[in-house]
């Protein structure tokens, strides 16, 4: 790369929130800057700030594992969380109106996440979908004009995913308790209506449109599959001390899902509702050979809206922003341009100041 342009980028990177390392391999190894996660690799090129995911937690403690939405190892970006005191798993599962003090705690938890810099908010329990509308609109109001997308449950993905399956296909919705999830079908509409009325008193017009959570589990394109019969998983959920070896659980869940898919070959994808089952999505993929979406998928999906486009596009442009990336002039093994014509153009440098 040209030395003048390289120096300019380095000077500007120094003033960014995340320091940049030299881009050549030898210098990068010697660079003392600590790169906390994969996003910092993007920041090396673009000087972008780190994205932050806010996790709204119910009042329930459990041992996190790789693949859980509360485990920092599940993501390559920053994670902050806030617990809604009084919103127990039982209350979340029932979906009944919350006591005033719990609603106040819910407001406080959302504020805490936004104040901590959360770019978007997800939940650690699928039953938080009952409060999807309320939290979505309250967060937007409190954020004061700053976009803060909210997706509290992987169930919000159920309708968009229907567009991806072929005619006659089904999405298997995996949940810890089939009975509890089916009850949601009857309650969700009335709960949403109550939240809309509450939100109107707060002068949040967006609450009139409860988009994204009108879920109909009686739709023949959905097949609700409960993990009630997977004994090792039920034991793990009930064990407050956690589970040290999850391999036996993963194998049992994978075998169970494979059996269900064999009995109903119309299933062509899985959507995991239960947050604690999300850590076994890899086993379900291997066992069934089908794509799997889970609570972690939500976090990664929303994060891309804040991190992906600028670096990948800008790095393919030259000084004027018009020169396309020539594969023959690129070190593919390192995944980064090596020629001077692939520098950031001045218009992009100005954007990153």
Swiss-Prot record:
Its EC number is 4.4.1.3. Residues 326-353 are annotated as: Disordered. GO terms for molecular function: dimethylpropiothetin dethiomethylase activity. The keyword Cell inner membrane does not apply. Residues 331-346 have a biased composition (Basic and acidic residues). Induction: Expressed at low level. The active site is at residues 125, 274. Belongs to the aspartate/glutamate racemases family. ALMA1 subfamily. This is Dimethylsulfoniopropionate lyase 2.
């Amino acid at each position: 790369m040209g030395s003048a342009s390289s120096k300019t980028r380095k000077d500007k990177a120094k003033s960014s929130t995340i320091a940049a390392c030299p881009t050549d391999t030898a210098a990068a190894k010697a660079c003392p800057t600590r790169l906390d996660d994969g996003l910092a690799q993007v920041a090396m090129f673009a000087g972008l700030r780190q994205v932050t995911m806010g996790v709204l937690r119910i009042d329930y403690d459990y041992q996190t594992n790789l693949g859980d939405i509360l485990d920092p190892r599940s993501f390559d970006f920053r994670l902050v969380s806030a617990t809604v005191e009084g919103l127990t798993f039982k209350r979340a599962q029932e979906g009944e109106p919350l006591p005033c003090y719990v609603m106040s705690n819910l407001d406080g938890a959302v504020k805490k996440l936004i104040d901590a810099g959360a770019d978007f908010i997800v939940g650690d329990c699928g039953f938080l979908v009952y409060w999807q509308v309320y939290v979505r609109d309250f967060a937007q109001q409190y954020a004061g004009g700053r976009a803060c997308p909210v997706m509290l449950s992987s169930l919000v993905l159920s309708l968009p995913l229907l567009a991806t399956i072929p005619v006659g296909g089904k999405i298997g919705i995996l949940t810890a308790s089939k009975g509890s999830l089916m009850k949601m079908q009857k309650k969700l509409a009335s709960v949403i209506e109550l939240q809309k009325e509450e939100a109107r008193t707060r002068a949040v017009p967006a609450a009139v449109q409860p988009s994204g959570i009108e879920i109909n589990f009686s739709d023949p394109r959905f097949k609700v599959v409960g993990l009630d019969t997977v004994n090792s998983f039920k034991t793990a959920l009930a064990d407050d001390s956690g589970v040290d070896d999850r391999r036996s659980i993963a194998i049992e869940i994978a075998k169970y899902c494979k059996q269900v898919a064999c009995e109903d070959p119309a299933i062509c994808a899985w959507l995991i509702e239960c947050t604690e089952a999300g850590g076994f999505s890899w086993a379900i993929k291997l066992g069934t050979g089908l794509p799997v979406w889970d609570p972690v998928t939500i976090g990664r999906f929303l994060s891309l809206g804040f991190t992906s486009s600028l670096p990948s596009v800008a790095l393919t442009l030259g000084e004027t922003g018009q020169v396309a990336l020539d594969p023959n002039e690129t070190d593919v093994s390192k995944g980064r341009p090596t020629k001077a014509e692939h520098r950031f153009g001045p218009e992009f440098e100005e954007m990153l100041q």
